Each structure stands twice: as structure tokens, then as C-alpha cells.
Amino acid sequence: MKILIINTGSSSLKFAIYQYENSKKIISGIVEKIKSQKSIIKIVNTDGSTTERFEKGIENHQKAIEKMFKILTNSDLKILKTLSEIKIIGHRVVHGGSSLKNSVILNNSILNKLKQISELAPLHNPNAITAIEAVLKILPHAKQVLCFDTSWHQTIKEHAFLYAIPYSWYKNHNIRKYGFHGLSYSYITKRSSEILNKKIDSLNLIILHLGNGASINAVKNGKSYDTSMGITPLEGLAMGTRSGDIDPSIINLMSTILNKTTKQIEEILNKESGILGISEKSNDMRDIWNKIEEGEYQSKLAVEIMTYRIKKYIGSYIAALDFNVDAIVFTGGIGVTDYGIRALALKGFEKIGIELDLEKNEMAQSKYLESEISTINSKLKILAIPTNEESTILEDIYNLIPKNL
């Protein structure tokens, strides 16, 4: 009996198969560049070996699900004999809104609620819904568990999650900060507790999940206390293609100047801003660093804007946690591999005793290895820990569907 875990991105679909009885991972993979002319499918075996193939453009996430199931039952790969071996599917869903606060087993009512809030995470939730419905068609009798990134942040207090807008907007329309990357933050908090040998309920952290989407989380006594993303994943840090914090008046101003609808401006803020918007080159940090080496000004400026924003948030969260912080933890694809971003984000903090070991930092470039990158004399630990959202999803699945099923 198998568990399939699906993580639906804006243009990707990650998947993994686990043995139900012992939580052992059997295989994982990713379909990349969905909606592009040429898509890529990668399979990662348990021994670390990979196979990669190019496919004629996979046009949407439904087709990606169908392709994934064909791969999983491919007789040459010997992953599954039949799809009926899969009894449970766990989905990462970015936004649960105000009505879906905890992980749930899918039913028609839950699916309808999810559709009603899809506009709150326009890059992710609609694709997750497509994937869920595609699985329903192919495996109608399997249980599907939805795990929300917003669930982790339910412990944030009103003074931190409310915007200074008419209170009726919150009471009548649930306009508030929700926060994201919660599955990642939940895992990192537990793992940091183990590494630091400190009980979770007394653990204070500042966690930075830095990838194409990026956010920061203040953790107080092992629970989410504040976070940079808002009602949607657009707020906060400058990201790969998202603007992060801006003056909201810009939306109407540019709508008038460019003769575009506010919806079109919002689309630009989500898909054409951030690192891509400033550099006008790429949202891939590898490309950006190459351009910086070539002396390209806008790419350098994009990194300066990104790391300055990170530095401001770290400083504000140190204050929000009453200057009682056990560790600063970097995670996400950029967070664990990009030593340059970490160094720039923490530059100057040595003046208050938060010391990055530059040599250790430069050595920490692996997607898979945990690293302590602070100096011996640093007042708090600085860690780089690869995230494991699948671990959080598995834990939630077993809480909802016991192993003696």
C-alpha cells in the first residue's frame, strides 16, 4: 500500500511515493516547465541516481498528473504494478483561507471551499485544484489529504495578522495576513529543536525560506509569531518574480499610466517583478550572479534590494521576539545553497554579536546537507537546513488516517 505526495507549483509538479506501513520513500520526481514548449521530467531513485527526459510541452497540470501516473506504472521503471496500490494522496496546498485552518480529508464540500478562495493564491491554488480533480478522475476511491501552508500560521495573534484598515473588512470579509511556507516552517522548527537540543515550546527562531518565492517567519516558543507574506504570497520580501512590499497606491497609479486593469497590474507584480523585474534578465539566481560577474548593474541592484529587504525583516523580527532568539535558520533552494545571499543579508549583524563564519558559509552550498555557519563566539546560532515539506505532509496524513487503516 502506497502514499503519493504531490506538491503543485506554478509551473511544476513534484511527486513522491512512500510505503504506507513504514514511511519509506520509494521514489520521487518532478515535472518542470509545465505550459512551456518543452517540459522536463526528472525521476530521483532512493540511491540518488536520476533519470531525465524531455517531453513535448505538457500544457497544464492535469496533463502533468496523467503523465506522472504513466511514469509510475511504466513496466521498465518497476515503481508500481498498478495505480490501485496508491491508497492515499497528500497534497501541499498553498492557501486554506479562513475556512480551511488544518489539514483535511477531501470531500465535495472541502473542494468547493477551496475553489472559492483560489484567487488568494493565484499562482498556486488553481493548479492544485486541477491536480486534485485529475487525481479524483483517475483514483476516485483513494483518500486525498489536503495540507495547507497557511495552517502553521494560525497561532499568529490579531495584533500581528490584522492590517490597519477598517475592522469591518476583517469581520465581514476575512481580510488579514495568512502567511505561507507553513509546511516548511513546521519541519524546520522541529529539526532546529533537535539540532539545538532545545524543547520546541521554549524555542525562538527566525527562519528564512528563500526560493523563487521567499518569506521569513518569527517563531516564538515553537509557534508562528509573525511572518512576512500576507493575505496572498505577494507581500513581504522581494522574490524571484514578486514585488513583495509596495505602496498599494502604485496599483491604481500604474493602472492609469499604463492603461491596464488593476488585475493586470497585480499580474505584473506577481509574475514580472522582484528579481526579474529589477534585473530585466532573469529570476534565476545563478543567472543573476553570472551577470553580476560580468559587471551588469541592474542584476547587482536586484540582489541589493533583495538582501536589504531580508536584513530589515531580520532586524524587525529580532525586536518582535524581544531580542531573545536562539537561531537564524536559512532554508529553501536559495537559502541553503546561495552563500552570497546569506552573507549580504547578515552583513553588519556582527556589530550586535550575530557572527557569520564566512568560510563555513561559503562551504555550505549543498541542497541536501545541514550546516552550522555561525562563528564559535556568535550570540546565536546560524544554520542552513534543507526543508522537507513531505515530512510534514506525511505526519499530517498519519494523524488523519492512522497506520492501522
Swiss-Prot record:
Pfam families the UniProt entry points to: Acetate_kinase
Cofactor note text: Mg(2+). Can also accept Mn(2+).
Pathway terms, separated by semicolons: Metabolic intermediate biosynthesis; acetyl-CoA biosynthesis; acetyl-CoA from acetate: step 1/2
The keyword Metal-binding is annotated on this UniProt entry: yes
Binding site for Mg(2+): 7, 389
Chain positions of site Transition state stabilizer: 181, 242
Superkingdom of source: Bacteria
PANTHER family attached to this UniProt entry: ACETATE KINASE (PTHR21060), ACETATE KINASE-RELATED (PTHR21060:SF15)
Name of the featured protein: Acetate kinase
Protein encoded by which gene: ackA
